[in-house]
Amino acid sequence: MNENLQDLISTKLAAAIANPLFPAVDSQLRSGRHIGQEHLDNYAFLADFQNELDGFYRRYNVELIRAPEGFFYLRPKATTLIARSVLSELEMLVGKVLCYLYLSPERLAQQGIFTVQEVYDELLNLADEAKLLKAVNLRASGSDLDKQKLAEKVRAALGRLRRLGMLYTVGEQNSGKFTISESVFRFGAEVRAGDDPIEAQLRLIRDGEAATPESIAAEKATADDESAVSNEEDFEYDDNQEGAE
């Protein structure tokens, strides 16, 4: 019986599944969460058993990806047996702004800490206001009431991205302050060698183009000619979904 079992599952995969960290890590990955180096134990666990767990998840038609920046996440295939993370248009746009802020000089000047208000202001500054209001199904009048509703949607979008492991609250839960994780590079612009990454991300926000899940660093370091996979294949896009889950 044991010999037959060993033919089906490797000793190292069995050790990974038996590890007390596995249930929590597995649940987080399946929920769409990104696990970076900030989570020391969980990250070390995934790094130690990456190959074995990737084979395990491929049985569900998903891949365990380790991004160039180091964070782990599950990338579903079209035939996935695990539910996909569905992001609204506004959540995608807020994610792109977070990536822009991560690349900005202000991140170092502010010790990596940003506020919800800064994201909202940057969003209004960088993106077309009419497109923003349309993205949240509001009339494009630009009234104070519309902007208030938009601000609420932005807060909800940030909450969703926080649950996906893309930002971390600083201080009190309702402080409005947070740090940005490297996993926001899931929203990074596709940049060819020699391009300014900040300018490229700025163009992405202004043009409202689809982002790619490949990081800027990977684009610069990789010489192959394969097309980058669009975010819509990783984060399923839903026109009708609002900002909150």
Swiss-Prot record:
<dbReference type="InterPro" id="IPR042037">
    <property type="entry name" value="MukE_C"/>
</dbReference>
<comment type="function">
    <text>Involved in chromosome condensation, segregation and cell cycle progression. May participate in facilitating chromosome segregation by condensation DNA from both sides of a centrally located replisome during cell division. Probably acts via its interaction with MukB and MukF.</text>
</comment>
<keyword id="KW-0226">DNA condensation</keyword>
<feature type="region of interest" description="Disordered">
    <location>
        <begin position="213"/>
        <end position="245"/>
    </location>
</feature>
<feature type="compositionally biased region" description="Acidic residues">
    <location>
        <begin position="224"/>
        <end position="245"/>
    </location>
</feature>
<dbReference type="GO" id="GO:0009295">
    <property type="term" value="C:nucleoid"/>
</dbReference>
<keyword id="KW-0159">Chromosome partition</keyword>
<dbReference type="GO" id="GO:0006260">
    <property type="term" value="P:DNA replication"/>
</dbReference>
<keyword id="KW-0132">Cell division</keyword>
<keyword id="KW-0131">Cell cycle</keyword>
<keyword id="KW-0963">Cytoplasm</keyword>
<comment type="similarity">
    <text>Belongs to the MukE family.</text>
</comment>
<dbReference type="GO" id="GO:0051301">
    <property type="term" value="P:cell division"/>
</dbReference>
<dbReference type="GO" id="GO:0007059">
    <property type="term" value="P:chromosome segregation"/>
</dbReference>
<comment type="subunit">
    <text>Interacts, and probably forms a ternary complex, with MukF and MukB. The complex formation is stimulated by calcium or magnesium.</text>
</comment>
<dbReference type="InterPro" id="IPR042038">
    <property type="entry name" value="MukE_N"/>
</dbReference>
<dbReference type="Pfam" id="PF04288">
    <property type="entry name" value="MukE"/>
</dbReference>
<dbReference type="GO" id="GO:0030261">
    <property type="term" value="P:chromosome condensation"/>
</dbReference>
<protein>
    <recommendedName>
        <fullName>Chromosome partition protein MukE</fullName>
    </recommendedName>
</protein>
<dbReference type="GO" id="GO:0005737">
    <property type="term" value="C:cytoplasm"/>
</dbReference>
<dbReference type="InterPro" id="IPR007385">
    <property type="entry name" value="Scp_MukE"/>
</dbReference>
